[in-house]
């Protein structure tokens, strides 16, 4: 346990649930930053199509998200290969589901409504962040008894 966590744990209102949400917001912020910066680099610097850029940004951010969520947000411990396989497959499976939501909303906002690519990316990240938290908290990293 980190020194920061030890200090925060002394606060009477600081619970494990608050810690989990706070860490998710911090790690989710980094994940979102990776996603948006990667998307921006691909679209504005490399001049790639937004659909390709969105896919590359998704891969980069999901890889970061898995390790940061496992270690810092949900503090998941999977001692057996079977548990590790279940956790990894459910994480990437649900992230792929939210990627489809992301992709479809991006097409709707950009091609359908004519919204700026970067603004569309920011709005879809809000939707995806909420969905990913719900899936991670109650399905993927759920404490098994």
UniProtKB/Swiss-Prot annotation:
Localization in the cell: Cell membrane
Membrane topology per record: Multi-pass membrane protein
Domain of life: Bacteria
UniProt record, GO biological process: polysaccharide biosynthetic process
Record keyword Acetylation present: no
Any one Pfam family match given in the protein's UniProt record, by short name: GtrA_DPMS_TM
Keywords recorded for this protein, A-Z: Cell membrane, Membrane, Transmembrane, Transmembrane helix, Transport
Entry similarity comment: Belongs to the GtrA family.
Record protein name field: Cell wall teichoic acid glycosylation protein GtcA
Organism of derivation: Listeria innocua serovar 6a (strain ATCC BAA-680 / CLIP 11262)
């Amino acid at each position: 346990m980190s020194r920061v966590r030890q200090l925060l744990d002394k606060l009477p209102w600081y619970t494990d649930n608050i810690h989990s949400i706070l860490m998710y917001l911090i790690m989710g912020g980094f994940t979102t930053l990776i996603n948006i910066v990667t998307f921006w680099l691909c679209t504005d610097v490399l001049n790639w199509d937004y659909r390709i850029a969105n896919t590359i940004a998704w891969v980069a951010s999901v890889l970061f998200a898995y390790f940061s969520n496992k270690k810092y947000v949900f503090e998941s411990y999977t001692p057996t290969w079977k548990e590790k396989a279940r956790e990894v497959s459910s994480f990437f499976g649900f992230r792929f589901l939210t990627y489809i939501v992301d992709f479809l909303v991006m097409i709707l906002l950009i091609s359908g409504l004519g919204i700026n690519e970067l603004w569309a990316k920011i709005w879809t990240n809000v939707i995806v962040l909420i969905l990913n938290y719900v899936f991670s908290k109650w399905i993927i990293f759920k404490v098994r008894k």
